[in-house]
Every structure is written in structure tokens, then in C-alpha cells.
Design a protein with these regions (language model features):
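A structural microfeature
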Residues: 59, 142-143, 229-230, 301
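Conserved acetyl-CoA-binding loop-helix of GNAT-fold acetyltransferases
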Residues: 85-101, 248, 254-271, 286-294
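Acyl-donor-binding surface of acyltransferase catalytic domains
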Residues: 86-167, 306-308
């Protein structure tokens, strides 16, 4: 078996486009691959094949990044021909080859419909992908709900329970530190096992500054008496406006203030003409999921995230 990037021959990109987007797990179509290549979010060096001795392509892996990314951020598409007897082994070898070339282990995002475990063919296709990812070092698994808001859902007006204002970098850093305490977010919980809250806060600030959204959108949320209640960080992806980050400080939780903060983010994006606002939360984060439901956001897919454990 030969594992290689689509860089050896000008025809390699055409081969990537020609690979059928079939199978029970959703795959990128030729049109979508072409669009992402044009936007520099997919690249030949991030597109990998597994070939047999005769040069037949048996598997395809497409890693994705932002247009200015130096290395890929996530694996978006992994396919193995139905004729392959052990798809997990071939896929694991393909992922390992890509990881070695990139010098890192990007997450693998698998987009799935709700109730996917109840569909035997789909569940089996997910299972070999999980096995391959695990063998390639992506041993941590998180299931997330992907939400979407459209103008048909409408917005709610401010109630006056919170006052939103801009803040300094240090104020936002402090808010990130405070919000991490008792967080139900699995990523936050995991990272806090290997670093302190301030280090994680600095990484979170850097992450959102690097997103396509604007720093000027960020808001601190205060009670009318000036007490910090939480934070709203509207953001964006290369495709749509995004909820970004929001939260309530521990001492103010349980009073419905998350609805006020989510409402502020939604109103902001809607006022800018957003036709779609996306968001994700862990499936086990019931309070956040309930807030999205109350705000009219709809679950559009389940996102199974397979990632490498923290090495710190």
C-alpha cells in the first residue's frame, strides 16, 4: 500500500475530484472540493490517497484549514473503497502518513444525522473510522450538536437584566478565567487538567482573535449594578456568522442569564444581516443545548470530534 499526497502529478487533483462521494457517511462532493481548493481551504498537499501496487486509489483523506493556515486544522473527509477488506487498517495508515507529513494531529470531524446509531450501515461506517482514528492517535472523542439559526426563528429584545459593553483585553482575559470554573464544556475540563485557568484563557483569547470575526464585536455582560455576569463573543467561520463563545460566571448561574447573552449575540449578528448563524455545543452540555432550543436554533447535525489527547 502506498500513501501519498496529491502533489506528484497535476492529474492528482482531478483524481481527488473524481473520487465518488458515496457511502453512508456524508462526503465532500466534487463541486465542494473544487470550491474549497479555490478558496485555499483544501490544498493538494493536504489531500492524501492510499493506492495499491497498480496505482488504483483505494482511499481518500481531505484535510481542511483556513485560507491562511500553515497546517491543516481538521480532517473533513475520509473514505475507503467498499472493496477493501479492512478499511480501518487502510484508513489508519493513511492518517498516520498525513500526520507525519504535517507534523501535527488535526482533529477529525465526522458529520452525522441525529439517531445515527440506530442505522446499522451508518453505525458500522462510523465504527471503522473511529478505529482508524484511534490507531492514528486520535483517541479522545467528543460528540457535539451543531445548531443553526435563520431569520425565520426571529430574535428577542433586550430585557434590561444585563448591560453589555466593550472591555479591555485584560478584562476579557479575566472573564475567560472566571467562566472556566465549573464549566460543562468537555474541552475546557480536559485542558484544565494539564494547565491553569489563566494559560487556558490566554489560548482561548488567541483562538478567537484568530477567527474571522472582529475583536470589536466582543462584549462583557454586567448586572445593572456593574457586577460582571458573563461574556459574549460573537464570531464567524469562513462561511457564516457564528455564536462563538458565551458564558455566565459561576456565582450568577442558574438564573436564566445565558438566554440574555445568547439573545445579545443573535441580535448582533441579525442586525448585521446574517442569514445563518451557526453554533456547536457538547451533547452532554444540557443547559447550553436547552438555551439554543429556547432561542429558536435548530440542530442540523451531530458532529463527532476525534482528537489527540493533550500532551501537556
Amino acid at each position: 500500500m502506498i500513501f501519498r499526497a496529491a502533489t506528484a502529478d497535476p492529474a492528482d487533483v482531478d483524481r481527488a475530484l473524481a473520487y465518488p462521494a458515496d457511502g453512508p457517511v456524508a462526503a465532500l462532493t466534487a463541486e465542494k472540493v473544487r470550491e474549497e481548493l479555490a478558496g485555499n481551504r483544501l490544498r493538494p498537499e493536504w489531500t492524501w490517497f492510499a493506492e495499491d501496487a497498480d496505482g488504483e486509489v483505494l482511499a481518500r483523506a481531505l484535510w481542511w484549514g483556513r485560507a491562511d493556515s500553515e497546517r491543516p486544522i481538521a480532517l473533513d473527509c475520509l473514505q475507503v473503497r467498499a472493496s477493501v477488506a479492512d478499511p480501518a487498517a487502510v484508513a489508519a495508515g493513511l492518517l498516520a502518513a498525513g500526520h507525519a507529513a504535517f507534523g501535527n494531529l488535526p482533529d477529525y470531524n465526522v458529520s452525522l444525522p441525529r439517531g445515527w446509531r440506530d442505522e446499522p450501515e451508518l453505525a458500522a461506517a462510523v465504527a471503522w473510522r473511529q478505529e482508524a482514528a484511534y490507531k492514528a492517535g486520535l483517541t479522545r472523542e467528543i460528540e457535539r450538536l451543531r445548531y443553526e439559526w435563520t431569520p425565520a426563528a426571529g430574535t428577542t429584545g433586550p430585557t434590561g437584566r444585563l448591560v453589555f459593553r466593550d472591555g479591555t483585553d485584560e478584562e476579557f482575559l479575566d472573564a475567560f478565567v472566571r467562566l472556566s470554573a465549573g464549566s460543562l464544556d468537555l474541552h475546557t475540563q480536559t485542558e484544565l487538567r494539564s494547565m491553569d485557568a489563566e494559560q487556558l484563557a490566554r489560548e482561548d483569547v488567541a483562538f478567537y482573535l484568530d477567527c474571522p470575526g472582529e475583536r470589536s464585536w466582543w462584549r462583557l455582560a454586567h448586572l445593572p449594578d456593574g457586577t460582571l455576569a458573563g461574556m459574549a463573543i460573537p464570531s464567524a467561520t469562513p462561511y457564516h456568522r457564528n455564536v462563538g463563545y458565551l458564558g455566565v460566571v459561576p456565582e450568577q448561574r442558574g438564573q436564566g442569564l445565558i438566554d440574555e447573552i445568547l439573545g445579545e449575540i443573535t441580535r448582533f449578528h441579525a442586525s448585521q444581516g446574517a442569514e445563518r448563524i451557526t453554533a456547536t455545543t457538547d451533547s452532554v452540555n444540557a443547559p447550553m443545548a436547552a438555551a439554543f432550543d429556547r432561542a429558536g436554533y435548530q440542530v442540523t447535525e451531530i458532529r463527532l470530534v476525534l482528537e489527540a489527547p493533550s500532551t501537556r
